[in-house]
């Protein structure tokens, strides 16, 4: 099994959701990123999403937009991202690593070249935000040919017909974007997420991860009762920004939030069963 499949098998056996954390590569610097990733893994994060910096991150809210700008200001380039991934894989041989971003930084050297570099660096899956399935004639094919997962996104407006298109060629897990709009600004109601999960799980056996707008342990725990994974991005990125602004250690801030989220997610189903 793949590292992603192994992780979901493990969390299922432990009767808990997985915690997926997003950080932007190179934020606040290329040199700082490896230790920040270590802080997440060592404090309960199960899967890492590493964002590829881009100048026009249209699906992202203010926190991640600013993280992209900080990473670009730090001159984080294509090769830096794969170097960070390669080093991560050496330190964490079992933790899934996903590259997440936009078509432009992923494919400007060609889909085959990108997929080959990702595979060589130990990447497990790819999330490309702005290539819809029906327009994905090259990237998804290249990713799958290298044995990596092409992870698709579904939204509240994805009906059954649309879900079938999204799921065609999808693997690893399905990422459910729980609100319409950009990351980090809103949160869907628990009832609407539960209904969406029922609808999605009726048409796929893939694990379903829920993200967008999850900022607190309480929000994460509510979603973890039913979702297979909880994705947190803007909250972690905001921790980095706040720590850097206040000249504090961003690792300590990430460790604290990761522990709180991990504990809340691990306890969610135990409390629901009482």
Curated annotation (Swiss-Prot):
Transmembrane segments: none
EC number(s) per entry: 4.2.1.20
List of catalytic residues: 49 (proton acceptor), 60 (proton acceptor)
Catalytic activity: (1S,2R)-1-C-(indol-3-yl)glycerol 3-phosphate + L-serine = D-glyceraldehyde 3-phosphate + L-tryptophan + H2O
InterPro entries, per the entry: Aldolase_TIM, RibuloseP-bd_barrel, Trp_synthase_alpha_AS, Trp_synthase_suA
Main enzyme class: lyase
UniProt keyword Mitochondrion, yes or no: no
Keywords: Amino-acid biosynthesis, Aromatic amino acid biosynthesis, Lyase, Tryptophan biosynthesis
Record-stated family: Belongs to the TrpA family.
Annotated function: The alpha subunit is responsible for the aldol cleavage of indoleglycerol phosphate to indole and glyceraldehyde 3-phosphate.
UniProt xrefs under PANTHER family: TRYPTOPHAN SYNTHASE ALPHA CHAIN, CHLOROPLASTIC, TRYPTOPHAN SYNTHASE, ALPHA CHAIN
Subunit and partners: Tetramer of two alpha and two beta chains.
Xref: NCBIfam families: trpA
The protein, known as: Tryptophan synthase alpha chain
Lineage of origin: Bacteria, Pseudomonadati, Pseudomonadota, Alphaproteobacteria, Sphingomonadales
């Amino acid at each position: 099994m793949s590292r992603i499949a192994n992780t979901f098998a493990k969390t299922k056996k432990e009767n808990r959701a997985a915690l997926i954390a997003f950080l932007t590569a190179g934020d606040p610097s290329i040199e700082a990123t490896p230790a920040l990733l270590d802080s997440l893994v060592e404090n309960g994060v199960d899967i890492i999403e590493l964002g590829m910096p881009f100048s026009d991150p249209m699906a992202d809210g203010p926190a991640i937009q600013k993280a992209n700008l900080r990473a670009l200001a730090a001159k984080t380039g294509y090769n830096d991202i794969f170097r960070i991934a390669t080093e991560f894989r050496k330190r964490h041989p079992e933790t899934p690593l996903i590259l997440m971003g936009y078509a432009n930084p992923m494919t400007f050297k060609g889909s085959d070249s990108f997929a080959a570099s990702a595979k060589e660096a130990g990447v497990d899956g790819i999330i490309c935000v702005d290539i819809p399935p029906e327009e994905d004639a090259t990237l998804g094919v290249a990713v799958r040919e290298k044995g990596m997962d092409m992870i698709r996104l579904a939204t509240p407006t994805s009906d059954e017909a649309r879900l079938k298109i999204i799921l065609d060629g999808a693997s690893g897990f399905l990422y459910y974007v729980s609100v319409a709009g950009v990351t980090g600004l809103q949160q869907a109601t628990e009832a609407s997420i539960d209904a969406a999960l029922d609808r999605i799980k009726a048409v796929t056996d893939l694990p379903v991860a829920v993200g967008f707008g999850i900022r607190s342990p309480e929000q994460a725990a509510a979603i973890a009762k039913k979702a297979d994974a909880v994705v947190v991005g803007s909250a972690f990125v905001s921790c980095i920004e706040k720590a850097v602004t206040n000249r504090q250690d961003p690792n300590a801030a990430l460790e604290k939030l990761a522990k709180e989220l991990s504990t809340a997610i691990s306890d969610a189903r135990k409390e629901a069963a009482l």
